[in-house]
């Protein structure tokens, strides 16, 4: 088990009222990082029948969130642990309309009026205390405008892109 029992219990409570179905599509290479992502998301999706895992072999490490089989525009090229674990939880809750700090109707209209397509990439450290706020805000843009994609990238895994 990757996630501790108390975390799984909290996730069960948080996701108890999900109204949509969510697929966490992971693409992963063979090896330790891919196995770690699989273990984490296997545990994560085990807490609710509306959460499913789809696993694909790939040369990159990636997690994409789908709502009712459709892309949400949210991708993590990371193992979203540390501070970014909250970003993953909120991505699901916000996609379901149950998260926190959801924008009001006026702000949603402004998001929907943005000239798209836009592909936003955030390079983050899983120990950064400010990064989750940025990631969560940009995820909201993707949720409210289908022409926007946001990808959070762990700079410690994708060092060649950071340099």
For every predicted segment, state its role.
Residues 2-42, 112-151:
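Local sequence-structure signature of Cys/Sec-based thiol-disulfide redox active-site neighborhoods
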Residues 7-11, 105-106, 163:
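Short amphipathic beta-strand starts and helix->beta connectors
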Residues 8, 23, 53, 92-102:
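N-terminal secretory signal sequences
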Residues 39-68, 147-163:
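Thioredoxin-like thiol-disulfide oxidoreductase module
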Residues 66-100:
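Non-catalytic, surface beta->alpha helical segment in thiol-disulfide oxidoreductase systems
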Residues 98-114:
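Long, charged amphipathic helices and adjacent flexible linkers at domain junctions
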């Amino acid at each position: 088990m990757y996630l501790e029992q108390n975390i799984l219990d909290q996730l069960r409570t948080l996701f108890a009222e999900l109204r949509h179905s969510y697929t966490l599509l992971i693409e992963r290479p063979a090896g330790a990082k891919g196995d770690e992502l699989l273990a984490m998301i296997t545990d994560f999706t085990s807490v609710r029948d509306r959460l499913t895992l789809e696993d694909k072999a790939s040369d990159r490490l990636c997690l994409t969130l789908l709502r009712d089989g459709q892309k949400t525009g949210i991708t993590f090229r990371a193992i979203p642990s540390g501070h970014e674990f909250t970003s993953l939880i909120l991505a699901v809750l916000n996609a379901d309309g149950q998260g926190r700090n959801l924008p009001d109707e006026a702000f949603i209209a402004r998001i929907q009026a943005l000239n798209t397509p836009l592909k936003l990439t955030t390079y983050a450290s899983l120990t950064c205390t400010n990064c989750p706020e940025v990631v969560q805000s940009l995820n909201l843009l993707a949720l409210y405008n289908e022409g926007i994609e946001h990808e959070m990238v762990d700079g410690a895994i994708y060092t060649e892109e950071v340099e």
